[in-house]
A protein has these predicted regions:
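Single conserved hydrophobic/aromatic residue that forms the stacking wall/gate
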Residues: 1-11, 142
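Basic phosphate/pyrophosphate-binding loop/patch that engages nucleotide-derived ligands
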Residues: 12-15, 52, 57-75, 174-177, ...
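Hydrophobic residues in well-ordered beta-strands that form the structural core
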Residues: 16-18, 42, 60, 195
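Active-site-adjacent capping/gating segments
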Residues: 23, 29-31, 35-37, 137, ...
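Intrinsically disordered, low-complexity Ser/Thr- and acidic-rich flexible linkers and loops
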Residues: 158-176
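Catalytic PLP-binding core of fold-type I/II PLP enzymes
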Residues: 7-8, 12-30, 62
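Active-site region of PLP-dependent enzymes
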Residues: 23-29, 36-151, 201
Length: 226
């Protein structure tokens, strides 16, 4: 957020949309994630710290925009006795049952965070002698919600590997490993794991397009540039 202030985007008076999908309960310098942008999106997917099995919410300080979003999410119906549509709308409204489940969980958010933190610390302690790092954060500024425990393999401990669009190949080396080899190993004992997300600007459908960084325009590396 600090780097955005005075940046090209802010100078051009752009709106800031915050992707706070998995960040509910996390803070940066004491400020809640989801409160930085003009708009923010929070996910209630089944793996999140607060969940309704699906769905999410839109956050904004603008009552006008919030009301417009509510209208669009309920098929953009006008105040008429029949179905009157002057705008394109969608049936995105969350059901009352799911909304009730989600609302009740907020009373237990800090308990959920404490349980996730215990899991994170258990992994951190158990793996401390291996050449890996648990997902890092700035302890002087950030307070995460620990919803996902992930690890980063030290570069010098990585075996040779190459990743295609749907497959990854690697060469086993003594004393070294890679995410694919680790996932194969834990899958063999019926444990769960997965790679973290591939950046959207590197996905095939987007990677030939320009994208915006805090320092201006950018473009993803693709096979076309090798």
């Amino acid at each position: 957020h600090e780097r955005l202030v005075g940046s090209e985007m802010c100078i051009r008076d752009s709106l800031l949309v915050e992707d706070a999908a998995e960040a509910m309960g996390a803070t940066w310098e004491g400020r809640q994630c989801g409160s930085y942008g003009d708009y923010a999106a929070v996910s209630y997917n089944g793996n999140k710290i607060i969940t309704g099995s699906a769905g999410g919410c839109l956050l904004t300080n603008s009552l006008e925009d919030a009301n417009q979003a509510r209208k669009w999410s309920t098929q953009a119906r006008e105040a008429a006795a029949w179905y009157q549509n002057e705008e394109v709308g969608y049936n995105y409204r969350m059901s009352n049952v799911i909304a009730g489940v989600i609302r009740d969980q907020y009373n237990h958010l800090q308990e959920h965070i404490a349980e996730k933190k215990a899991i994170y610390n258990r992994y951190k302690e158990g793996l401390k002698d291996l050449p890996i790092k648990m997902n890092p954060f700035d302890e002087t500024k950030a307070e995460p919600n620990y919803w996902l425990s992930s690890m980063l393999i030290d570069e010098e401990a990585m075996c040779k590997q190459v990743r295609g669009e749907t497959e990854a190949l690697y060469i086993s080396e003594t004393g070294k490993s890679c995410p694919t080899e680790i996932l194969d190993a834990i899958s063999s004992i019926n444990a769960e794991g997965r790679p973290i997300w591939k950046p959207m600007h590197m996905q095939p459908m987007y990677r030939m397009h320009e994208f915006i960084t805090v320092n201006g325009s950018g473009r993803a590396k693709t096979n076309a540039y090798i």
